Amino acid sequence: MNQVKTNITRNFPHISRVMIWDLDGTIINSFHRVAPCFDSEGNLDLNKYKNEACKHDLIMQDTLLPLVTYMRQCMNDANTLNIICTARLMSKSDYYYLRKQGLRGRGDSNIRVFSRDTLHKYFEADKVSEIYHSKDAVYKSYYFGLFKQLYPNADFTMIDDHKGVLSAAASYGFKTLDAQAVNDILSIGVTLIGETFIDESLEDDNDYQFLADRLQLCWEGMTEEERAEYSCSPQQYIEKLKVA
């Protein structure tokens, strides 16, 4: 865990539930512009990303992934604080896109954005550059520590498609959801099963085989071509949840 001095002057002990959302590959499909900027371990090459992938017209071509439906449900829950924690260096175009999609509020909105361009607000100046240039899991770990200070009584859930980030979140005691796997299952098209599955996967007393059997019914009704579009089978997804 990364223990570092922060600039926060108060915390929010009344917050009891925090959902932390990644952007790329979790709720936004930016693959068309961001994919060339990732290294073999899934970390963002910041220079390449900034120079090649951040043009306004490219950002406006991004699309939404199925998990955004669940995110919007959480945004409508007055008892839930939603955090966007992204590896991006957010530009005006990024914030505009979020507002355009109804994912960025103002004033008393129950969603906050933490990104590389907001580091200076929360961390000492001599640490910002080090955190900024860290790999994704390390970079987000600093924010995880900050969140625990800000919301000391909250139950946290991290939704991300980066396995290293999920492992880091788990080390802080956060619940985790593999966004790639969940989006795959949701995109099969059985919305009710998908949303119920997400809720049940967060419960402590899961019967994983029961969940696998339910998903298997969907899987068996698909053609081989349809199955090839997804990154894992239902049983493989269950195994991922067990690890998380």
UniProtKB/Swiss-Prot annotation:
| Gene3D superfamilies registered for this protein in UniProt | HAD superfamily/HAD-like (3.40.50.1000)
- Residue ranges of the TM segments: none
* Molecular-function GO term, any one: 5'-deoxynucleotidase activity
- The superkingdom of the source organism is Viruses
Q: Which reaction does it catalyse?
A: a 2'-deoxyribonucleoside 5'-phosphate + H2O = a 2'-deoxyribonucleoside + phosphate
Q: Any idea which UniProt keywords this protein has?
A: Early protein, Hydrolase
**Main enzyme class:** hydrolase
Locate the coiled-coil region(s) and give their ranges: none
Say if the entry is tagged with keyword Mitochondrion. Answer: no
Q: What induces it?
A: Expressed pre-early in the viral replicative cycle. Expressed with a few other proteins from the first step transfer (FST) DNA. FST DNA corresponds to the first small portion of the genome that enters into the host cell at the beginning of infection before pausing.
Query: Under which EC number(s) is this enzyme classified?
Result: 3.1.3.89
Is the keyword Hydrolase assigned to this protein?
Answer: yes
UniProt function note:
Following host DNA degradation, is responsible for the degradation of 5'-dNMP's to deoxynucleosides that can be further excreted. Active on deoxynucleoside 5'-monophosphates but not active as a phosphatase on ribonucleotides, deoxynucleoside 5'-triphosphates, deoxynucleoside 3'-monophosphates, or deoxyoligonucleotides.
What extra comment accompanies this record? This gene is part of the long terminal repeats present at both ends of the viral genome and is thus duplicated.
What is the name of this protein? 5'-deoxynucleotidase
